[in-house]
């Protein structure tokens, strides 16, 4: 006899997708603003602001491919602020989650316009964000930032994110 909540694949995938989006927002909020535009040691690579702008750009492309209009806002790597980035990431997470949710509710294998099946696309976007969150954490450390243990456990999902995320 099964115990606990029954398995609901589509709902749990959407929940994990939204949680991944909130983790990206959380990272943006905990990074010191002084690191936001600092060049990587050695001068090669993206700044943290540029990484976040890139993440949003990819999300925006796929949201628009899937029919979101006007789609999530673009971010300019030269002028984006952490507050603006957090808001834009929230919008893109919500718009993409809505596209995936509609596909799941209608038993469609794809979000029309996206290049991959819905589950594959959702997982790709989670992986893409996770990869770039890792880059941001590594860059922050390389620039001298030490993450608090609580922050790291929240980023890794072992501790709940703050309720406003």
What are these regions (language model features)?
Residues 8, 12-16, 80, 84-87:
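Short, surface-exposed alpha-helical recognition segments that flank or form part
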């Amino acid at each position: 006899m099964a115990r606990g909540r029954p398995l609901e694949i589509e709902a749990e995938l959407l929940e994990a997708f939204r949680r991944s989006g909130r983790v990206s927002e959380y990272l943006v909020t905990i990074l010191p603003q002084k690191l936001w535009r600092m060049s990587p040691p050695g001068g090669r690579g993206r700044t943290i602001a540029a990484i976040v702008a890139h993440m949003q750009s990819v999300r925006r492309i796929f949201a628009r491919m899937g029919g979101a209009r006007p789609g999530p806002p673009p971010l300019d790597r030269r002028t984006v602020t952490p507050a603006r980035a957090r808001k834009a990431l929230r919008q893109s997470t919500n718009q993409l989650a809505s596209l995936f949710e509609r596909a799941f509710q209608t038993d469609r294998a794809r979000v029309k316009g996206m290049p991959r099946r819905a589950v594959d696309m959702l997982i790709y976007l989670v992986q893409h964000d996770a990869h770039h969150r890792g880059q941001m954490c590594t860059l922050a450390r390389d620039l001298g930032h030490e993450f608090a243990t609580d922050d790291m456990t929240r980023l890794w999902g072992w501790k709940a994110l703050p309720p406003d995320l």
